[in-house]
């Protein structure tokens, strides 16, 4: 895995989030879901260095539990392959929920499988990122997905 630093992409996102905070809004709250503690720490670190508020959980089941008690999540970034519930299954549950369906969901995977990517996008994923996720990926997501 490559070393991730707060490069130019992270600075752009940080500036954009700081502008939101100066305007009186709270930083966007991102729910990061990954069963790998290493990958979870990497994505959470990138998001936090860009001044996002991050909650990181290790499963789709825990993500749904958290969303049930705190639906004010700005975006969900989830791994595709996880035990018990895949990121694809989490995506479907979020999009089927009248309370949660407007939350943008981004799927991540270490595998670049075109049919999987297409299926996730057709089910309503905002984007599909191939790991390792970089600060520039987060910058692009912020400018495109979050208002």
Curated annotation (Swiss-Prot):
Q: Where would one find coiled-coil regions in this protein?
A: none
Q: What happens when the gene is disrupted?
A: Dwarf, narrow leaf and low tillering phenotypes.
Q: Could you tell me which SMART domains the record lists for this protein?
A: REC
Question: What does the entry's PTM section describe?
Answer: Two-component system major event consists of a His-to-Asp phosphorelay between a sensor histidine kinase (HK) and a response regulator (RR). In plants, the His-to-Asp phosphorelay involves an additional intermediate named Histidine-containing phosphotransfer protein (HPt). This multistep phosphorelay consists of a His-Asp-His-Asp sequential transfer of a phosphate group between first a His and an Asp of the HK protein, followed by the transfer to a conserved His of the HPt protein and finally the transfer to an Asp in the receiver domain of the RR protein.
- GO biological process, alphabetically ordered: cytokinin-activated signaling pathway; phosphorelay signal transduction system
Q: Which InterPro entries match?
A: ARR-like (IPR045279), CheY-like_superfamily (IPR011006), Sig_transdc_resp-reg_receiver (IPR001789)
CDD domains from the xrefs? REC_typeA_ARR (cd17581)
Q: Keywords on this record?
A: Cytokinin signaling pathway, Phosphoprotein, Transcription, Transcription regulation, Two-component regulatory system
Could you tell me which cysteines form disulfide bridges? none
| Modified-residue entries (4-aspartylphosphate), positions | 79
Q: Which residues form the Response regulatory domain?
A: 29-146
User: Induction: what does the entry report?
Assistant: By cytokinin in shoots.
| Family from the record | Belongs to the ARR family. Type-A subfamily.
> Briefly, what is this protein's role?
Functions as a response regulator involved in His-to-Asp phosphorelay signal transduction system. Phosphorylation of the Asp residue in the receiver domain activates the ability of the protein to promote the transcription of target genes. Type-A response regulators seem to act as negative regulators of the cytokinin signaling.
Official protein name in the record: Two-component response regulator ORR11
**What would be the name of the gene that encodes this protein?**
RR11
């Amino acid at each position: 895995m490559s070393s991730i630093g707060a490069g130019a992409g992270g600075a752009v996102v940080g500036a954009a989030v700081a502008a939101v905070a100066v305007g009186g809004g709270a930083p966007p709250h991102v729910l990061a879901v990954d069963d790998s503690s290493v990958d979870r720490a990497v994505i959470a670190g990138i998001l936090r260095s860009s001044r996002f508020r991050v909650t990181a959980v290790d499963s789709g089941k825990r993500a749904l539990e958290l969303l049930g008690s705190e639906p004010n999540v700005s975006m969900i970034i989830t791994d595709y392959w996880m035990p018990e519930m895949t990121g694809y299954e989490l995506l479907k549950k979020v999009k089927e929920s009248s309370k949660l369906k407007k939350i943008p969901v981004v799927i991540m995977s270490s595998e670049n499988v075109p049919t999987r990517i297409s299926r996730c996008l057709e089910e309503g994923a905002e984007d599909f990122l191939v790991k390792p996720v970089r600060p520039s990926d987060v910058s692009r997501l912020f400018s495109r997905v979050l208002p």
